[in-house]
Regions:
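Terminal helix/beta-alpha structural elements that buttress the NAD(P)+-binding lobe
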Residues: 1-185
Length: 185
């Protein structure tokens, strides 16, 4: 039977031949390869190369939640958008899972970060490093923000249009989830 799930965290119970950087009893976490989803099983056999030691301050639940959303943010910001220091990025839904990591990563890179969030989440997204928080319930983001080097839409739907609208000519955009149709050039 098919066993779903990509994010995992657990304790190493056995090792394959040639594995030297892990030992039985190590607490680990990671993301199953595409096509190898099985993380919701009680035990999984997984390549050691995609396993990381779990930081002791994280619970297993927190570590499992970290892997795929963190990886999604990393690939989107660094690989797809190729965000650089001193660039400006707009991130939709800054208080969400992937977006909250993207805000922190973008700030770490040295970018100026603008994000949309409900008013109740403005202090939170600022604590993550956002330079500017836009209340999407009170402001038309597409009119309030412009000239961004990059946009990362983590919400989808009609919000996708905002990502295109905030970009400067030649700006870069990345999207996760399902979005609205791209505007005609």
């Amino acid at each position: 039977p098919y066993i779903p799930g990509r994010d995992f965290s657990g304790v190493v119970s056995a090792l394959g031949a040639g594995v030297t950087d892990l030992k039985v009893g190590d607490e680990v976490f990671g993301v199953c390869d595409v096509g190898q989803e099985q993380a919701y099983a009680e035990k999984i056999a997984i390549k050691a190369s995609i396993v990381a030691k779990k930081p002791p301050q994280l619970s297993h639940a927190d570590a499992a939640a970290l892997a795929l959303i963190g990886l999604t943010a990393l690939v989107s910001v660094e690989d797809t958008l190729k965000l650089k220091r001193d660039e400006t990025i707009f991130i939709s839904g800054g208080a969400g899972g992937v977006a909250s990591y993207a805000v922190q990563l973008s700030k770490h890179i040295g970018a100026r970060v603008i994000t949309s969030a409900s008013k109740a989440n403005h202090d939170y997204v600022r604590s993550l490093g956002a330079d500017e928080a836009i209340d999407y319930n009170a402001v038309d983001v597409a009119k309030a923000v412009s000239g961004c080097d990059a946009a990362f839409d983590t919400v989808g739907g009609n919000v996708t249009q905002q990502a295109f609208a905030v970009l400067k000519p030649g700006g870069r955009a990345a999207f996760i989830g399902s979005g609205a149709k791209a505007p005609e050039p």
